[in-house]
């Protein structure tokens, strides 16, 4: 069956560019979060998680990435202890969006757990449900999506 509608014209609608851009930014953040939490751990690991966030710099998000050496220097033993269960090196990603352009305003802070796959150590977690441990990074995915939404819509926060 051939489509019978070839064009559509909306009459009387106000300019929707402004509201659309805001909603597009929010939808982009939600989509980013969904994509991150859907990736399997052989695709999404600490380094690739950081790589998938680097494009936020183009939206004006400041990215700070800590590697193993920097975390050790800062005394982040608990995080490094968890990371020892993987052949992949650890990463910690911090993101900053300053929509006010001022440094004297107290920030709003989001913290999200970003363990890309948590086995809990050798034999500490039962095998049943182990595949669900990829969602231990859902908090960091949500924060990454929120930063995308804030920066893409140029939020004043």
Stretch-by-stretch model annotation:
Residues 117-124:
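Short acidic/His/Gly/Ser-rich catalytic and metal-binding motifs that mark active-site loops
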Residues 53, 108-110, 124-157:
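Alpha-helical metal-binding/catalytic segments enriched in His/Glu/Asp
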Residues 1-116, 149-153:
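N-terminal hydrophobic/helix-forming segments and targeting peptides
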């Amino acid at each position: 069956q051939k489509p019978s509608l070839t064009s559509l014209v909306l009459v009387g609608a106000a300019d929707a560019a402004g509201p659309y851009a805001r909603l597009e930014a929010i939808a982009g953040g939600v989509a980013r979060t969904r994509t991150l939490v859907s990736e399997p751990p052989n695709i999404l690991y600490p380094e690739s998680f950081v790589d998938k966030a680097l494009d936020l710099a183009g939206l004006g998000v400041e990215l700070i990435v800590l590697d193993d050496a920097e975390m050790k220097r800062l005394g982040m033993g608990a995080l490094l202890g968890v990371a020892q269960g993987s052949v992949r090196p650890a990463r910690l990603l911090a993101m900053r969006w300053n929509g006010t352009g001022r440094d004297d305003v107290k920030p709003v802070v989001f913290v999200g757990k970003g363990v890309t796959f948590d086995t809990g150590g050798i034999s500490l977690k039962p095998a049943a449900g182990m595949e669900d441990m990829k969602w231990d990074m859902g908090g960091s995915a949500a924060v990454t999506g929120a930063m995308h939404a804030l920066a893409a819509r140029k939020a004043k926060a």
